[in-house]
Amino acid sequence: MAVKIRLRRMGSKRNAHYRLVVADSRKPRDGRFVEEIGYYNPTTEPATVKVDEEKAIKWLKNGAQPSNTVRSLLKKTGVLAKFREQQQ
């Protein structure tokens, strides 16, 4: 199973917020997912990002590939740096 960490759209029209989820890459964007690891709300000022670091690092170690947007969010929160430290 090819696993990705990606954003799942929530909210109403023009008021979107997202959940960071681990999902099979073959499933639809808002379809079934394996585990929820955080959320992202771009409409607040400044944008709100919360990530469960333990879960995110666990999935990255298991080979889950983050999408481009999720990768940038993980960099901002410092999770990607912690993951790279643990790899060395």
UniProtKB/Swiss-Prot annotation:
Belongs to the bacterial ribosomal protein bS16 family. It comes from Halothermothrix orenii (strain H 168 / OCM 544 / DSM 9562). PANTHER family: 30S RIBOSOMAL PROTEIN S16, SMALL RIBOSOMAL SUBUNIT PROTEIN BS16M. It comes from the Bacteria. Keywords: Ribonucleoprotein, Ribosomal protein. GO terms for cellular component: cytoplasm; small ribosomal subunit. GO terms for biological process: translation. It holds the Pfam family Ribosomal_S16. One of its GO terms (molecular function) is structural constituent of ribosome. NCBIfam families: S16 (TIGR00002). InterPro entries: Ribosomal_bS16, Ribosomal_bS16_dom_sf. Gene3D superfamilies: 3.30.1320.10. This is Small ribosomal subunit protein bS16.
